[in-house]
Amino acid sequence: LPDSNALAIEIKSSWVEASTLPNPQDYVTVNAIIPTYDTTNNQIWKPNGEKKAKMALIGIHIVGSVAHHPEMIWATFEHESNTPNAKYQYVDSTKAKTVKTVPQDKGTGWLFSNTTDTALTAYNNSHMTDTTATGAATDNIIATPGNTISPSNTMQTLPWGSAWGQPTNQQDSSSAASNSEIISINNNVRGMIPGEDIRKNYLFIGAIWTFKGTPPTGNGYDQNPVNPPASGTTIGTSVLANTTMETYFQSPNFSCFTCHSDSPASFAPASISHIFSKLEPLYRVHDQLNKKKK
């Protein structure tokens, strides 16, 4: 291809141990080596080794290259059983184009929620972190103040990457219009996947990019809904979040570009992607492997 960046792709995914699921056959699975922890203290878990395990895919970001969009297109997908949705609206497919409201999901049995409480305050309260009180990141899992290391209930508060009553881009007049497009894509693609293919169990939540492919500023369209949008404004489903990776970062003011951007706005690889700052020379990896063998 004439462009060396054509077809470039970046993937970030989230997994759980398949052995913890009642229906692992409904998930994409892989075998992996994962860290193990000493869990005797409910305030801090420390790594104590590794093990082989079958892992089940629960969420995935796919960042793909598109002509004239050097910021790339950021899409995210989730397993349909992850979390309940907050209420949202869509436009039905009848001639009347009626706006319909889907009430907040209720009930138990979700992978990351098991409460009958319908108050939004019952959800998305983190019980653990990897950061110390001084702000230093560690390999430990640490209980947040007043909690033990334990499960908490999660909700998708911004279904389909839009905020209730707020426009998400310059072409859709409402969140209902934007939601309808994402729901329609899911219905159409699922209709083309044959039989009991497990890919039917995953939902496209949405995708974002910037207006005219300009360097991202991190500002979402809903924060300044003008037409045309300002340079670097996030459009598409502009408050996109994945409940398995941005669990506690769901906000009508946030999207992928909130973190994957710089000031001043730039297309520099390290400004858009977090991978480049974490790259390690191969000779260093080689030396580490040799030390382990000894």
PLM features: residue spans?
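A domain-level signal for the mature, folded cores of soluble proteins
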Residues: L1-N48
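Amphipathic interfacial helices
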Residues: W45-K46, E50-K52, H68
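Sequence context surrounding c-type heme c attachment/ligation sites in exported
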Residues: A8, A18, N23-V28, M55-H61, ...
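A short linear-motif detector with a strong N-terminal bias
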Residues: T39, K51-K52, G236
